[in-house]
From Swiss-Prot:
This is UPF0482 protein KPN78578_15540. Residues 38-60 are annotated as: Disordered. Residues 39-48 have a biased composition (Polar residues). Residues 1-28 form the signal peptide.
């Protein structure tokens, strides 16, 4: 019985010692914490290149937007002109869809209804 108790104490001591060694070794590996802000030379260079590309394509985007706006305005004006031409009291007025103008049937000239 005395021998079994000694074995248990010995085993417990060995387990405790190995646990201490294990935890101290894992603690030693993480005794420093390095936090990077992500602000490295490479990320700054990439951000600079992206900004440059964005600025280079800005004028192109503006041109596309202006053209789309002009086309929209043109279609809007033509729709209003067609509506006014068809509502006109002038019986000789007709809408020419190819030229988007209100014309006189007799003369073929553009009229303002």
């Amino acid at each position: 019985m005395n021998m079994t108790l000694n074995k248990r104490w010995c085993l417990t001591a060995i387990l405790a010692l190995s646990a201490v060694v294990y935890t101290s070794s894992s603690y030693a590996a993480t005794d420093r914490l390095v936090i990077e802000s992500g602000d490295s030379a490479q990320s700054r260079q990439q951000a600079s290149m992206e900004k440059e590309q964005w600025n280079d394509t800005r004028s192109l985007r503006q041109k596309v937007n202006k053209r789309a706006e002009k086309e929209w305005d043109k279609a809007d004006v033509a729709f209003d002109a067609q509506d006014n031409c068809q509502k006109s009291a002038n019986v000789n007025a007709y809408w020419e869809p190819n030229t988007l103008r209100c014309l006189d049937r007799r003369t073929g000239r553009a009229i303002n209804p």
